[in-house]
């Protein structure tokens, strides 16, 4: 389903800064996700990809994979350029859960499998997360690196890496 770079896991950081991004060539189409994790002078890059996916799914997968790479509870500052993921996790998810994973219009929540995975990960991980939106493709070095990793994920999905 997903692939990640074979680099060591950051095992017990006190504070981790994470940048995530997703990419999709066509929507749906081949997609990729990428994340940059930094703590105490150590950096880790992870990425992966899937065929027949969407940009929103890749944005969510980037967040899930980045947080899952942290093996101990820690304080996280997570930068992302996806309003969908940011609002979903900080505003909408509480109502969705209360309504049995349905929107206010009573429609099933899109990408519910990933929302449920992210929700379970947040509950079980013990991470304290400060969610921060950053404008994509606007020169932020961390976001640009996450974007490049997401595009590498697309290439991996296409069998070019």
From Swiss-Prot:
Listed cofactors: Mg(2+)
Gene Ontology terms, MF aspect: magnesium ion binding; nucleic acid binding; RNA-DNA hybrid ribonuclease activity
Subcellular location: Cytoplasm
Alphabetic keyword roster: Cytoplasm, Endonuclease, Hydrolase, Magnesium, Metal-binding, Nuclease
Domain RNase H type-1: start-end pairs: 12-155
A GO BP entry: DNA replication, removal of RNA primer
EC number in record: 3.1.26.4
Binding-site positions, Mg(2+) 1: 21, 59, 81
Cofactor stoichiometry and binding remark: Binds 1 Mg(2+) ion per subunit. May bind a second metal ion at a regulatory site, or after substrate binding.
UniProt: Mg(2+) 2 binding residues: 21, 147
CDD domains: RNase_HI_prokaryote_like
Assigned GO CC terms: cytoplasm
Catalytic function, reaction form: Endonucleolytic cleavage to 5'-phosphomonoester
Described function: Endonuclease that specifically degrades the RNA of RNA-DNA hybrids.
Family statement: Belongs to the RNase H family.
Record's subunit section: Monomer.
Protein name: Ribonuclease H
Highest classification ranks of the organism: Bacteria, Pseudomonadati, Pseudomonadota, Betaproteobacteria, Burkholderiales
